[in-house]
Amino acid sequence: FYNCAIGVMRGAEAIDEYIGLPRQEAFDIEYWALEEAKLQRMPKEKEFARKVVVVAGAGSGIGRETAIRFVREGAHVVCADLNEEAAQATADEISAKIGKGIGVAGTGVSSCGNVIGVKIDITDSESIQAAYDKAVYAFGGIDSVILTAGIFMAPNVDGEFSVKQWELVFKINSIGPYLVADAAKKIFMAQGKHMKSSVVITTSVNAVVAKKGSVAYDSSKAASNHIVRELAVELAPYARVNAVAPATVVKGSLMFPRERVMASLKKYSIAYSEDESTEELRNKLAGFYAGRTLTNSPITPEDQAEAIFFMAGDRSSKTTGLVFNVDGGLHEAFLR
């Protein structure tokens, strides 16, 4: 190699003057092709790598499974819940599996790793902003907001709902989603249109299915369906807004305590014993609901998490204002 280089230099000097390559160009020739080959052999980056996702309702059920799903695909996740201990429990469960990173120094969450737990009250603008502030301080911004929090209230013994019940159900199920998305809008606008942000809200197929005993809940979900469409208009072009509408999810849901499960079994004339465990009773009820669907399948939190993950990501980048049913084929919820 040395002799060849000397020969080239002598040949150049015989004609005119030898001028060596700039050091950067020589480096590019010698090393860049090798580095490029190394990059091409690296595994493909996960779909939500380097993205930050806030999951409101992450303390249980659909929200918990959604947080786990996003972390599995590389996201940094803020587990938020009205029950701060439940939110932190989900965060701790995830951290135990994936480990902790170094976080961001000086933020108070310097050992946060990929996930943190925070408190959020989706009916309180200050609480929502505080949760978002912690997300931004920990991870630098927010790419997606997922809202799975909700409430079901049963009527009294006479089948009536009080005004206070109506107000609380609508405050959580309808006004809450608006407040959460509206507060996120300010962050999305500051980050810019190029960030391709998204919001996914859990509504319900009960929004279009009329039945006795749940008029407040069903009406609030009908309102939230249209709020999603309005938010899609309001947040464009900074973020897409969509909804995932599940059929009844019994597994892991705080909306199905033992008392409600037993009341539902009695309502549908399903035989049960009070000696059975809560899990056994829930499985019976889930089996009944599954039998009403075209696929005869129980609807699980994992099913909803998968749909939410899809709606939040780039694979649905051309979709906004959509209410996406994940109900096993509940024909009563077919729109007409």
Where do the protein language model's features map onto the residues?
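Short C-terminal tail/terminal secondary-structure segment
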Residues: 152-155, 308-309, 320-336
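Canonical Rossmann dinucleotide-binding motif of NAD(H)/NADP(H)-dependent dehydrogenases/reductases
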Residues: 47-78
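Substrate-binding pocket helix/loop in short-chain dehydrogenase/reductase
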Residues: 156-158, 162-167, 289
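Active-site helix of classical SDR
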Residues: 181, 220
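Active-site loop immediately N-terminal to the catalytic Tyr-X3-Lys motif
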Residues: 158, 209-215, 296, 314
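Alpha-helical segment proximal to the catalytic Tyr-Lys
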Residues: 186, 233-237, 317
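Residue(s) in the substrate-gating loop at a strand-loop-helix junction
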Residues: 204
